[in-house]
């Protein structure tokens, strides 16, 4: 059930992010890359520079959200769970919420910050609180991606 609902949510978030970028961007597509694929038919609906290698940036935030939603559904955390902010997280460059070392942020607020602001400091807070480090969280994201049959 999680995979069905989780995948639907994941597809929704990806599509929303894509559309948000398209409709709010004032620059041309020549410097960006995008691809939209129909999940069921595998038909490419739209693509621009789809084969160019790029840093995944916001896609990692979407996977971070996916993992948070999975943990919420499994009741491993709640919306009220407080995530501690480390020195590393507080030092992340923009986009950020300017969280202070030693402070906390509730899961529900972290979710909103990731969706609305794509906050790097919050992504680091989530990673460190779930996996202990960004490096270990990256391994967890890779594991989730493989379970979702995602590949590069």
Which ranges hold each PLM region?
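Active-site-adjacent loops and short helices of periplasmic peptidoglycan-processing enzymes
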Residues: 24-152
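Bacterial N-terminal signal peptides that target proteins for export
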Residues: 2-14
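Bacterial N-terminal signal peptides
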Residues: 13-22
């Amino acid at each position: 059930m999680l995979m069905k609902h989780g995948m639907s949510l994941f597809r929704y978030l990806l599509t929303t992010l894509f559309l948000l970028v398209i409709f709010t961007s004032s620059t041309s597509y020549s410097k960006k890359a995008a691809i939209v694929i129909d999940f069921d038919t595998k038909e490419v609906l739209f693509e621009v520079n789809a084969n160019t290698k790029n840093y995944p940036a916001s896609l990692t935030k979407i996977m971070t959200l996916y993992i948070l939603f999975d943990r919420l559904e499994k009741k491993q955390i709640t919306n009220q769970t407080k995530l501690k902010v480390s020195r590393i997280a507080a030092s992340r460059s923009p986009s950020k919420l300017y969280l202070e070392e030693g402070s906390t942020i509730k899961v529900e607020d972290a979710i909103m910050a990731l969706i609305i602001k794509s906050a790097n400091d919050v992504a680091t807070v989530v990673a460190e609180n779930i996996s202990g480090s960004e490096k270990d969280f990256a391994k967890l994201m890779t594991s989730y991606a493989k379970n979702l049959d995602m590949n590069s």
